[in-house]
A protein has these predicted regions:
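Residues that scaffold the ATP/ADP-binding catalytic core of kinase and kinase-like folds
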Residues: 19-21, 25, 131, 140
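Glycine-rich beta-alpha junction loops
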Residues: 14, 78, 126-127, 143-146, ...
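Cytochrome P450 core scaffold surrounding the K-helix E-X-X-R motif
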Residues: 20, 149-151
Length: 194
């Protein structure tokens, strides 16, 4: 595409950040082929368990995972998904080994955590919120740097575990082809931010 400001890519976490790290060959190089214009959305995940689970908070989940290495399961939206990487990051930063169970999206992982087929799931806040608000799921933590206004009593991972630096969010933004003039990018950014 011509770098003239008339071609705009709606970029997101999967194809523009995860895929380049996971797949050896892609027909594009996000860092070389595109220039960011603006970040328009950040969507945190919620670490959830069934409401009737004996696990009451994230610290208890980590303690259980330390006591039973590899026996605690976390569901994700699929191999290489943002929720998969968020779960692995949690395991690494907490110093535990949890068993990853990949699903084809958030909905099947939520079904299995509700049925206690898995211990926890990491859906996006958009997917998990209805079940949390209805009381069917217990939110253990949010994966953003700050608490969610819609779940003010649910701590961040950092708060729950007393660590620093955990953040795992899905995101969306606009990019243009590399070579687009800075004047066009600045104008687009200004318009998006109005």
């Amino acid at each position: 595409a011509q770098p003239d400001g008339y071609t705009v890519l709606m970029a997101n976490l999967g194809p523009n950040a995860i895929n380049p790290a996971v797949y050896g060959r892609l027909p594009y190089d996000t860092l070389k082929d595109f220039t960011p214009v603006v970040l328009v959305t950040k969507v945190p995940l919620i670490i959830v368990t069934a409401a009737n689970s004996p696990v009451k908070d994230l610290r208890q989940l980590v303690s259980l995972a330390k006591a039973k290495p590899g026996q605690i399961t976390f569901g994700s939206a699929g191999n290489g998904s943002g929720s998969h990487l968020a779960g692995e990051l949690l395991s690494t930063m907490a110093g535990v080994k949890m068993n990853h169970v990949p699903y084809k999206g958030d909905a099947p992982s939520l079904t299995d955590v509700l049925g206690q087929q898995i211990n926890v799931a990491l859906p996006t806040s958009l997917a998990g919120m209805p079940q949390v608000k209805s009381g069917k799921l217990r939110a253990l933590a949010v994966t953003s740097k700050t608490r969610l206004p819609s779940l003010p009593d649910v701590p961040t991972v950092d708060e729950a575990l007393g660590i620093n630096g955990y953040e795992a969010v899905s995101w969306g933004g606009f990019m243009v082809p590399s070579g687009t003039s800075q004047a066009i990018i600045a104008k687009m950014n200004s318009e998006f931010n109005k």
